[in-house]
Amino acid sequence: MERLTVTLGERSYPITIAAGLFNDPASFWPLRAGDQTMLVTNETLAPLWLDKVRSALEQAGVKVDQVILPDGEQYKSLAVLETVFSALLEKPHGRDTTLIALGGGVIGDLTGFAAACYQRGVRFIQVPTTLLSQVDSSVGGKTAVNHPLGKNMIGAFWQPASVVVDLDCLQTLPARELASGLAEVIKYGIILDRDFFLWLEENIDALLALDGAAMAYCIRRCCEIKADVVAADERESGMRALLNLGHTFGHAIEAEMGYGNWLHGEAVAAGMVMAARAAERLGQFETQDVERIIALLKRAGLPVTGPETMPPQAYLPHMMRDKKVLAGELRLVLPLAIGKSEVRGGVPHDLVLSAIADCQQA
């Protein structure tokens, strides 16, 4: 078992990583006998994990209600959020309740935002079931729902009480979802950890085969990096923005193509190549390193080009709604080398369009 801590003073919390955690009632710290909870999951995951998690909680004397939502990015919306609020109010649940997010990034983001809003804030626990959520979205307190005009535009910073990562969940993960998660894994190597990127080049096949030791190390290392970044910059005023490599381009793809048609990691993968091409055109990133990124993404089963039906000009309106835009200026996360990156403003729009076009022709 691995246990890490996200250090945020009195709001610090543990990340527990191991196989078989759902079998142990003690995994769901800080819940105690008599606590009231609302377990939020989706229609795909409920048959797989709901009974197991519910049983563990009830063994510990925890009171469990549940709400089962439709599955898909298109349901990460205000309308579905209201479904969660209605379930909480109908019981009713008070300010001392705990929400439990059992699912991937959509469930985690939506449940976390519900927790941030309900009665002006209640406790919640992240129980991520996808690789993407285990290595990224469950850690750090970013919660949100989407708007038709932009991804994650309505949300709050609201830290969980704990994160419970049961490695057994990956055994039921579809191959496409596994690849999507690997995009965020590869991102960490590009932005902050060259040695980890080199390790990924050597071990990507083991991760695709769900090798237990390789996957445990991979998730732990990603969570270590994320925890350190969040501890240093919780509200994304500086260093934390580096975690958005590829996301400005990727969110544009998701919004333009319709939420759910491209998985988040797929869009981020294409976006990271676009960011690398932009950095290459600026003369700050070597062509051979662009090719290494492309090669690793391809081996992970990820796209390295944008949608054929989305011309470069379609990206900019979405990109200008990005949360990193300041005073009307587009700011991009760009690599400087494998393992080093920066947030850069003032990148000419023509250069951005050319970088996107480079990827369309790849």
Swiss-Prot record:
Cofactors named for this entry: Co(2+); Zn(2+); NAD(+)
UniProt subcellular location: Cytoplasm
Catalytic activity: 7-phospho-2-dehydro-3-deoxy-D-arabino-heptonate = 3-dehydroquinate + phosphate
Binding site for NAD(+): 71-76, 105-109, 129-130, 142, 151, 169-172
Pathway noted in the entry: Metabolic intermediate biosynthesis; chorismate biosynthesis; chorismate from D-erythrose 4-phosphate and phosphoenolpyruvate: step 2/7
Keywords linked to the UniProt accession: Amino-acid biosynthesis, Aromatic amino acid biosynthesis, Cobalt, Cytoplasm, Lyase, Metal-binding, NAD, Nucleotide-binding, Zinc
Protein name: 3-dehydroquinate synthase
Originating species: Cronobacter sakazakii (strain ATCC BAA-894)
Lineage: Bacteria, Pseudomonadati, Pseudomonadota, Gammaproteobacteria, Enterobacterales
Gene responsible for this protein: aroB
